């Protein structure tokens, strides 16, 4: 085999990346993955050519979204036919398919031209660590996360809280919330829970949750 | 601008029917008659052999006299043809007058010898670490008939050579070029002939890779032999990279090391190919004939004064 | 001046990397000129420069306000008028960058002619293919559309020689001081 | 003779119909030379033979006749490596045929060209390689495209990737994590302690 053939094989080889999506923001990591799938991270990138690399995204179930994005953000599916207009909130979508959130973020970061389909086909998403052996063998590099993984409150050891420097002293007369809410819990009898009336027509797509999900506007979600 | 729609043919838009039929008939006759027989360039009117030879002497900046060039350009088959024509014309073999010119076999032998020596010297000087078999393989490739035939047809000897058939065969072309080198050697001296060889035969290597001309059957075996000579340990190959192992576009990058020192690396679709190419790459780096090697200074070989003393 | 050795880049004019919003480790601290480590770098690069036999050099050249990366034995094509005829040897003045496999010297903006010599020879002067420009002006009675045909004169130049004539400018003084 | 700018060329038989304007479809080539011309110490002019067919009487070859009368000797003396044949052909259009070393031929009709234009065409034949009018796919030609090594996905990657088993723990964090608020407070606290102790 000639030297230049070996060189061409090396230069145009398709590199397989692994991405651990635990605690990562799908939007920021979606931008990185889209760039790698299109091959724009290579100096030999050319729009006509498919110089993209493959990416295996794991732990997409543990993706972290900002603030109350799980509830307020939604997947809008608009079709011309009736009854196919859906506004699925992300938490519902996550239940249906844990890998879909990251997939949609990468899809939105890709320019919507004809080869997007083929580039997206090079993205393999898995909800947990379980990856088929023949795929994990291909991996040769790992994409680094795009945010610092925070420490959960229940992971804090009492030692940390003690050593953390005291910024200021609480005033003596301050009363922390010592109300014991469990006492005032009332179990709602089933007959009181509002039934979902089946509504047809324009409201059909929107009215499928017993709590109000303002998908377009940002409002407080009233949970009773 | 309204354009009339007209019938059209390969001869252009159809104006008159009789013209179209006439041309179609001519075309059919041509196909039946077959291509024109090949003719000697000297058969055409605008041909003057002395002027051509005079121009040829000036073309390459070599000061040759016309007679030696005429000898270099005449082929043995041309002389045979003359003798045959004379015998047909009834002249007995004895009283045929000797010709003013001779064929170019001896000059060709001389030229080939000069070219061979010079090429060996130049390659050995510029690639000192390259083994002798490699240099011989390269000189054999450079002096092979096909290469020399291309070179001489590129120098315009195709029409200048006098031989029995219109387009000279590769052997005639090679003889002509070597005879030309021999005649330079006679007229102006060996150094001038060697500069000619450097400018036209050695430059044939410009686009080519030395390591590919010399096909090494078993690169790893050769590598072990070379390392033993240098007193280093046997080569080991390690996998440096492997992507897409189970996919179709799999790439392995294998590196060759001896006693933890890096020798060479290369990529391949499978591990065996990558290893073999890595061995070739290691050889290339050991012999210092890889891309970062400077190009052969074709015109400065003598200015560097390195070839004269050898 | 910016000298890069293989992978490690020595940024002589140290500038804080504005784009990165994180503290960038400085490769080279400020008073760098007379440091011992940089002296070795200068001497190493100068030795590489003298070793003429084994280093294929490449250069970036500006010709007819186009920049070309050239090595020896390669052909560049200059499009428009170019005075020299076939067989003329040219020396290129505007050399922006010179390098080999181990070092790269970048001029700001061009390198000193006493340091670098890049020569070429004119091989061929031909005409380009026939190029056509179609022009259309609506509502014009006499001539509404026009085809403008031309051929550009092309000149092919082969690069014959790239040489470094001396040590890298600016490095020998500091070593001698 | 220097070849001055000739942007507007009145090509003898340049009709729109014969012109093919689709750039992608026109025949194209890469730059190449015969026999690595120019690499060695000498340059070989590719034009071998030049045949000028001219009519002594017709008006169309007036320029060709002027050129032959005035410039032919100077041209032949300047370029001894080119064989020039002059063919007087009665009542025919003037032509220029250039034959090149590699055997290519170029034919240029000279009807109604004046002496200066004939000279220009002859010099364009002289400086050519033999097959002009190609669309160039690339403006340059190199045999050694890269000296420092062509980029591969592995050039700028750390070498330890092959030894790791994926998913790898320490490759998941950010490469240059920003200093979070808690870390800043802890650093300030340590500094305060240091200042107090020192």
Where is each model-derived feature located?
Chain B
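Double-stranded RNA-binding/processing signature
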Residues: 1-310
């Amino acid at each position: 085999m000639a030297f230049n053939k070996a060189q061409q094989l090396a230069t145009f080889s398709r590199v397989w990346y692994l991405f651990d999506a635990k605690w990562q923001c799908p939007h920021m990591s979606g931008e990185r993955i889209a760039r790698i799938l299109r091959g724009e991270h290579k100096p030999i990138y050319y729009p006509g050519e498919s110089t993209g690399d493959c990416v295996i995204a794991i732990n997409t179930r543990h993706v972290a979204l900002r603030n109350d994005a799980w509830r307020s953000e939604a997947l809008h599916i608009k079709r011309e036919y009736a009854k196919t207009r859906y506004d699925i909130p992300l938490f519902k979508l996550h239940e249906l398919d844990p890998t879909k959130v990251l997939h949609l973020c990468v899809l939105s970061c890709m320019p919507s031209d004809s080869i997007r389909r083929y580039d997206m086909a090079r993205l393999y998403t898995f909800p947990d660590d379980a990856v088929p052996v023949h795929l994990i063998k291909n991996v040769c590099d790992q994409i680094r996360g795009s945010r610092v993984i925070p420490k959960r409150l229940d992971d804090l050891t009492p030692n940390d809280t003690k050593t953390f420097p005291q910024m200021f002293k609480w005033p003596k007369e301050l009363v922390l919330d010592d109300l014991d809410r469990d006492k005032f819990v009332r179990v709602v009898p089933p007959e009181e829970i509002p039934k979902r009336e089946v509504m047809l027509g324009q409201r059909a797509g929107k009215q499928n949750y017993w709590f109000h999900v303002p998908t377009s506007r940002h409002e407080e979600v009233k949970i009773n | 601008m309204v354009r009339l729609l007209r019938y059209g043919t390969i001869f252009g838009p159809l104006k008159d029917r009789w013209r179209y039929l006439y041309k179609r008939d001519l075309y059919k006759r041509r196909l039946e008659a077959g291509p024109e027989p090949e003719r000697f360039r000297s058969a055409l009117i605008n041909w003057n052999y002395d002027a051509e030879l005079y121009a040829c002497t000036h073309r390459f900046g070599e000061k040759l006299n016309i007679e030696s060039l005429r000898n270099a350009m005449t082929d043995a088959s041309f002389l045979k043809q003359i003798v045959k024509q004379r015998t047909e014309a009834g002249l007995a073999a004895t009283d045929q007058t000797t010709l003013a010119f001779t064929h170019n076999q001896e000059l060709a032998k001389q030229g080939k010898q000069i070219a061979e020596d010079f090429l060996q010297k130049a390659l050995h000087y510029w690639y000192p670490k390259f083994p002798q078999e490699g240099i011989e393989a390269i000189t054999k490739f450079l002096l092979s008939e096909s290469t020399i035939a291309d070179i001489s047809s590129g120098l315009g000897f195709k029409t200048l050579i006098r031989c029995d058939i219109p387009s000279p065969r590769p052997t005639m072309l090679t003889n002509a070029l070597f005879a030309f080198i021999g005649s330079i050697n006679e007229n102006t001296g060996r150094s001038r002939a060697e500069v000619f060889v450097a400018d036209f035969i050695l430059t044939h290597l410009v686009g080519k890779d030395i390591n590919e001309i010399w096909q090494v059957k078993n690169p790893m075996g050769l590598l072990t032999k070379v390392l033993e000579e240098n007193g280093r340990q046997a080569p080991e190959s390690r996998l440096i990279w492997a992507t897409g192992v189970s996919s179709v576009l799999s790439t392995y990058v294998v590196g060759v090391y001896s006693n933890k020192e890096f020798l060479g690396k290369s990529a391949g679709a499978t591990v065996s190919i990558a290893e073999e190419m890595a061995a070739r790459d290691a050889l290339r780096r050991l012999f210092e004939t890889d891309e970062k090697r400077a190009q052969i200074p074709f015109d400065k070989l003598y200015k560097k004064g390195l070839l004269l003393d050898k | 001046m910016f000298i890069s050795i293989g992978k490690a880049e020595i940024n002589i004019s140290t500038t804080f990397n504005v784009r990165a919003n994180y503290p960038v480790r400085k490769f080279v601290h400020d008073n760098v000129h007379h440091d011992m480590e940089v002296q070795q770098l200068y001497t190493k690069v100068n030795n590489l420069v003298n070793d003429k036999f084994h280093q294929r050099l490449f250069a970036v050249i500006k010709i007819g306000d186009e920049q070309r990366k050239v090595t020896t034995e390669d052909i560049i094509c200059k499009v428009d008028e170019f005075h020299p005829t076939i067989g003329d040897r040219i020396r290129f003045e505007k050399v922006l960058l010179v390098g080999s496999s181990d070092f790269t010297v970048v001029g700001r903006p061009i390198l000193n002619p006493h340091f670098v010599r890049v020569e070429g020879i004119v091989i061929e002067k031909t005409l380009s293919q026939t190029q056509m420009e179609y022009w259309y002006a609506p509502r014009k009675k006499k001539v509404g559309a026009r085809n403008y045909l031309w051929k550009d004169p092309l000149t092919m130049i082969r690069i014959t020689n790239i040489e470094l004539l001396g040590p890298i400018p600016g490095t020998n003084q500091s070593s001698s001081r | 003779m220097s070849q001055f700018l000739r942007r507007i060329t009145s090509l003898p038989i340049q009709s729109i119909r014969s012109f093919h304007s689709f750039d992608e479809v026109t025949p194209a080539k890469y730059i190449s030379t015969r026999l690595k011309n120019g690499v060695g110490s000498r340059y070989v002019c590719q034009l071998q033979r030049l045949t000028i067919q001219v009519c002594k009487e017709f008006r169309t070859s007036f320029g060709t006749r002027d050129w032959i009368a005035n410039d032919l000797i100077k041209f032949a003396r300047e370029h001894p490596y080119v064989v020039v044949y002059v063919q007087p052909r009665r009542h025919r259009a003037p032509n220029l045929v250039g034959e090149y070393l590699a055997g290519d031929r170029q034919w240029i009709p000279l009807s109604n060209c004046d002496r200066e234009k004939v000279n220009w065409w002859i010099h364009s034949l002289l400086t050519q390689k033999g097959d002009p009018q190609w669309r160039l796919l690339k403006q340059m030609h190199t045999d050694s495209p890269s000296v420092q090594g062509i980029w591969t996905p592995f050039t700028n990657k750390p070498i330890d990737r092959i030894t790791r088993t994926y998913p790898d723990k320490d490759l998941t964090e950010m490469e240059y994590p920003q200093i979070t608020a808690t870390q800043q407070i802890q650093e300030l606290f340590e500094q305060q302690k240091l200042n107090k102790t020192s």
